[in-house]
Amino acid sequence: MRILYHHRTASKDGQAVHIEEMIDALRCEGHVVQVVAPGALRTTDSAPVQKSHGQMGEDMGWVHRLKAHLPKAVYELMECAYSYVAYRKLVTTARAFKPDVIYERYNLFLLSGLMAKKRLGIPLLLEVNAPLVQERLHHSGGLTLRRLATWSEGVVWRGADRVLPVTHVMADFVRGRGVPE
């Protein structure tokens, strides 16, 4: 299967380890995986094609400084606006790569996978690791645009062809938001 794997993670942390392991596991199962993410575009054998700021593992301190100096609402709108940047990358890559499926690691305010699915008619598999609206409300300094965040989370979860929660607890939460199994 040809899989277009999309994520918005730039930092080299636990998320990055999970992402790299998922991509490696998919490839070990014989799938051809093309990654679309902040920073480097990657070939199907995982070698970077080009490096740019934002590649997983690079210093992302500028993002934290930006977040600290902007009003929360502005930063959250920027997160949402990034969906357009990611959407353009996804559509361009998908047209060249011709994937069977888009596999996206869910992130708050990230609408690009759903937008690409609707534009190109490619099924969207959505990996959900956490209820990010709740997480951001209670941790990470809070959430200003709660209604927008709740809407975007719901529309992406319900718009995916399959939602892949990583735990039974997360699956119960996703079902509670009206996402069919």
Language-model features: where?
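N-terminal subdomain of nucleotide-sugar transferases
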Residues: 1-51, 162, 171
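A short, charged, and often flexible helix/loop element on the N-terminal side
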Residues: 46-89, 141
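Membrane-proximal helix-turn-helix segments that form the acceptor-binding/catalytic region
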Residues: 84, 88-92, 115-118, 132-133, ...
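Glycine-rich phosphate-binding loop signature in dinucleotide/nucleotide-binding domains
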Residues: 93-98
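Structural motif
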Residues: 100-101, 162
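Short His-centered aromatic/hydrophobic patch
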Residues: 104-109, 128-129
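Alpha-helix capping/helix-boundary segments
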Residues: 108-109, 169-171
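Helix-loop-beta element that forms the nucleotide-linked donor phosphate-binding surface
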Residues: 171-181
